[in-house]
Amino acid sequence: MRALVKFLGVTLLALLVAAYIGVGLSRISFNVDILRLLPTHLKQVEGLSLFLKNFALPDELIVTIDAAEPEQAKAAADAIAIALQGRPDLVKMAVAEAPWDNNPANLSPFLTFVLLNQPPEKIREIAKQLAPDQAAYTLQETLEELNSSVSPIKVAMLTYDPFRIFSSLMDSALSGLSGTSEFSSKDGTFRVVYVQATAPFPDYQKTATWIKDIKALCNEAISGSGVELGFTGEPAFVAEISTDMQGDMMTSAPITLALISLIFWICYGRFLPLLGLLLMLQLIFLLTLGTAGLALNELTIAGVGFASVMIGLSVDYGYFIYQSSLTHSGTTRSLQWNSLQSIVWTAGTTAAAFFALNFSSLPGLSQLGNMVGIGVCIGALVMLGLYAPLVLKFRKPLAAPKTSRLDAVVTSDRFARVGMWITLGMVVFLLGSLVFKGLPDSDFSAATFRPRKSESHAALSKLYNRFRDDRGFLSLIVSGKNESEVWERLNRAEDALQAAKSNGTARHFLSPLPLWPELTHQKANLAEIKTLSLQSPRLKSSLLDNGFTEEAFALASAVFAQTETWGNHPLPIWPTDQASSWILRRLARHDEGNYLALGIVEPSPGCESALVASIQGEGVHLVSWGTLGDQLKQTLPREILHVSLALLAGILLILLVALRSIRAVLLFTITTSLVLLCLAGAMSLLGMQWGFFNLAAVLLLLGTGTDYSILILLAFKRSGDATQAQKQFASVIFLCCTSSMAGFATLGLASNMGLAALGQTCALGLLIDGMISLFILPHACQWFLKKI
């Protein structure tokens, strides 16, 4: 009966655990927004978040077409647009040319909107140009300029605007539409098709499937034409990065498990204990991932890296228990009790290190810390509660204890002696490198967040190279609770930008102020333009008398008609036609409670920081990925230092309680400092750079690599013999160090460059930490703790 109850209890527990894991896994999604990794209080992060949320166009894919001849590129663009428009189940709109290219009159609602937003005095100036005594003079000026101008843009504009109603706006509202095209390069051999999805994407899997379908349709449409296609834009980035993140998580854990299996087999050559260890690690991984799904809902780029790190750390407790079981002759409970102290102290400091990342203002690191910290705690419990009983059951009755194959090597005097000299040589060499080469360089640019290989970024770079390259420009983002608040802030920003242009910190800027409605302006200008529209017969007759055709009056006539249409429209007016929507989609947002305007500023070289400081204010952001990198370079090292010092203080307090020796704590501090200095020297020697991700390696090393020092110090406290302490934990430190290095080294293969840098830095740091702790610290203990 007791056996049946026990069986039912175990079965019920297994079902509950499976349900818990299943529910958690079903809730996981990926967030590829790199700004989710960064401090939200930074103005650059806040401004770029507004930009990505409102102007990144998550449903718009950009298809680039590169051909040898302009005609070939045009034909391919048209063929792709037609093919995609034939699939309304996938595509809402495929645009291969500007909506006003074939008929400039399509611009009339937008041009009317721009006129309505001008200061009333400007509209009165235009009215004077059209007065009976000035109209003919204005037309003669236009004819002279048409005959002498070498600018095709100006000629085209004056041909449709002989009364110069809109030409005066070329330097402001329309300057962003002149000189360049967002559909074709100047030579016509590079073109772009903008593709909008039928509906928003619910998740990254649907995005990836949609991208795959669009690629197939595009390739079929231009089959055999010899043109080269590229795909970029927000959907392409989301699909690419999310797929890479999923692949990283699904491949890093198995590779880590394979490396751990190899290490275990080389050391012990036992199949059943290895199988049990792998099952425990998979259970720990699933429990941690399920917990993350319930608690976090979505994983960032940093969170994806937790799997290999957590497995590499949790296996340490399994190694320790198995190594202890080889010479254990008591019960399961006594094995658990004997292992408890070392595991609690090492797991406690490791978990504390990762949980301490919550004191940082970096959400990405906080998520990584929480996931690994939870995993380490779960790992310690699973190894003590489940693996310890298993390893004793796997041991054959009456068989002689079987030690590790490496015990004879790693516990030998020769191994300790050679290891000490090699480690001393390494320390001297790395410290010398640090002295002569200096500290490693730093790189906090957006490039460190990107995938190693990215088709979408390659397509975007080609687009920048063939069109206007505005990557050095700053985005002006102005937000407010309503139109009036945004308009007031835009005015202040424009005054500040004019001052910046005068003092040389800004070269040029495109302000969205002429595109932003102001109620009193629109009301006054509607009345003024209505008055002008009543003079249409006179204006048209004057135009014909001066040698222009009726077609030259079509645009002005359409504007006058649009003014009549908007006569009784509630103010402020926003146009809703296709051409206006196309232009404003990247310049303005006016949803209820979400009002934003976007402009562009070209800074003078080297003046970016000063310009940002002079313009930025409440509701006004001047941002770019470059200025974000500069801000991170200033704030992150200081923040990491503060968190590291707080974490180190916590670890020292724990050690003071455990060791009850100020000298031992001081020795631990010296050892940790030496490890970090050697790591800096190694990075400088190898040309590695500090960045957002691998700065966090300092925190991770404080929680992972310090375990090796703690084990030696605890063993020395118990025995008082440094040689015995070294031999007791030589195998354990070797196994723990190699397995943790395997976890981080696997992370070094990640598709994301920043995450890979974190893995490489931590693996290098663990190697240095393990060698110093195993080969130098015991001698330091013998000398420092006995003689001082």
Regions flagged by a language model, labelled:
Residues 294, 310-326, 340, 344-359, ...:
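Transmembrane alpha-helices and their membrane-interface boundaries in multi-pass membrane transporters
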Residues 273-320, 664-712, 745, 782:
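Hydrophobic transmembrane alpha-helices and their membrane-interface caps
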Residues 278, 328-360, 721-751, 770:
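Pore- and gate-forming transmembrane helices of large, multi-pass membrane proteins
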Residues 420-543:
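Juxtamembrane segments of multi-pass membrane proteins
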Residues 23-68, 172-182, 320, 416-420, ...:
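Solvent-exposed, non-transmembrane loop/terminal regulatory segments of multi-pass membrane proteins
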Residues 147-266, 270, 561-652:
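Extracytoplasmic
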Residues 21-22, 75-191, 504-581:
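Alpha-helical transmembrane helix bundles of large polytopic membrane transport and channel proteins
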Residues 1-32, 388-389, 393-445, 458:
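Signature of alpha-helical transmembrane segments and their immediate interfacial
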